Amino acid sequence: MQKSPREFPRRGHIYTADLDPAFGREIHKKRPVLVISSDVFNRGTPFAVVIPISSIIPDVTGPEMVEIGKFKGLDKKSILLPLFIRSIDQKRLHKKIADLPKEKLLEVEDALKLVLGMVSLD
């Protein structure tokens, strides 16, 4: 994503991103991602912290996954995968395709707390 001085990816926006090359079982290829890093971070650095989105939904999902369904910009029922959170160069971001609804962003934050050990699983 080429950014002008005022343009930067914003928290809660969904972009297509190229996650290749990847190693081992990391999420890869061109796919939608959710920008989860703060606007201050995104504006002040060339990086963005993102969570990959997949349209392949397992039969059994856990609290570390967030189903986001299908909405404008995402034409397939999809799932966010906070376990695969990563920092990427903003140049990997391509087209903005959607905004994640606020209530879903709160679910993502809860899932991230589990993944990062910020809350107990008990």
Range-by-range predicted roles:
Residues 1-122:
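Conserved functional hotspots at enzyme active or ligand-binding sites that engage polyanionic ligands
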